[in-house]
Amino acid sequence: MGYHIVNFLIHFLSAAFLFFAILYLLETPNLKEKFSKRRNFIAFLSATLWAIHPIQTQAVTYIVQRMASMAAMFYILSILCYIKCRMSGASLHRIFCLLGCVLTFLLALGSKENAAMLPASLLLIELTCYKKFNWRFSKKIYFWGSVVIGVIILILTVWFFSPDITFSWLNGYRNRPFTLTERILTEPRIVLFYLSQILFPLPNRLSVEHDVILSTSFFQPWTTLPAILLTLLLMGLGISQIRKRPIIALAVLFFFLNHIIESTVIPLELVFEHRNYLPSMFLFLPIATGFKWLYDYCAAKKQPLTGILFGLLVLLMVSLGIGTYTRNLAWATEVSLWRDAMKKAPQSARPLTILACQLYYGPAATSCLYNEALRIYENARTLSLK
């Protein structure tokens, strides 16, 4: 129980830091003219929708994924410190905020490696939220250019002197049932699947395990090429909206940017829902601002739809809350978790194997469950031999 309480506190702090980060983002030059009047409501709604969404269950309830939630907590706190640094006029306060930004970045990086994308996220915030991409434009260009060139030189140097070490991480594919090429081709479908889970978090679509058909070429399965093209289209849409609709650009590009480490070339498992914990942080911002715009429009026209809008909003939040509660019921015990996964990923041997072990050896094991455990294990063995 203590582990879950700490995880919940981390989640609560992450939501609070996200609230303040959005609150101050809406005070940046590109956004304050449109959104500063209702920024408290927008920030609260956006952070709340993120916090109560069922897809966050795995990152919060799964004790091992404290690394993901802690990384996200320090990550968003680092962004908050950066924004405060940009807003501050006093030199001492700016230095303090900048040190906080660096320290929390290191803490995020120490929690989980996907926090390495923070510099790119800060650059994205600069591009979307500030009219002039500078603190003296030329100096910033020189700085970021030097960073990129320095990283490239470092990678090339290490590769030149120790090519085996540089690409040793590729050896991980020896223990995976897929190749590097198959992973790269498959991941666009998975990232779009993540997006669909966030937009339509139906209970039967959320699981600790998912059946994944590997993409072996652009046309096998046929959804591979459309998924790649749609992913590129969404990223292109985000880039094209940097000036016109910066909130959409920030939400879309932040999502894809922070999936790069875990959803590209590194030989990790293909799909896990907790990987959306950090990338989804700004995805609900366009929804919140869209609701605010629609409400203001109806209020200006003196239409009775404002009450209906709030009713729909309450219905949405209650639905998400119920979905999260239902999802947590599946995580109540190891047996309930893997029974749930067995139903939702019937072609995967892992849920069957783990469930059989829990029924045979686990705390809930009884003599009457042995036969069921053996039957499930035989099914797992059959699937693994396919």
Show the residue positions of the predicted features.
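Polytopic membrane enzymes that build or remodel cell-surface glycoconjugates and lipids
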Residues: 1-386
